[in-house]
């Protein structure tokens, strides 16, 4: 299972309405931390959002360490991820989202995201790549 950056933000004390990691810790969903992978680009994106919001660096360092300790972290520079991400640019404009989606596709793992464009194209993605796109709401129902 690949998770989008949104779900990592609470680790850096950035508030979101979709605290999936808290739900996992409290066993409100059937996902385990060891089943989750993220792309390294999500770690960068978390740092960038935290810097923009002026989150104290120590909280960001703690978040990054927790991510690397808890989840499988996939590099964004793998050739197959790059190739798939370039193909996805025809549909998804945000290149970081392309990388995250390409990670799910190349690993053949489902993606949990709140990205409206990815969710809008979920049927096409499922038909072409045989992975499911899920939202927080769908996971927690």
Outline where the language-model segments fall.
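Short, well-structured N-terminal submotif of metal-dependent ribonuclease cores
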Residues: 1-38, 50-62, 140
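Alpha-helix capping/helix-boundary segments
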Residues: 7-8, 42, 80-81, 99-100, ...
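Residue-level signal for well-ordered alpha-helical positions
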Residues: 14-15, 49, 88, 124-125
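Acidic catalytic patch
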Residues: 37-41, 63-90
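Acidic, metal-associated active-site segment
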Residues: 94-110
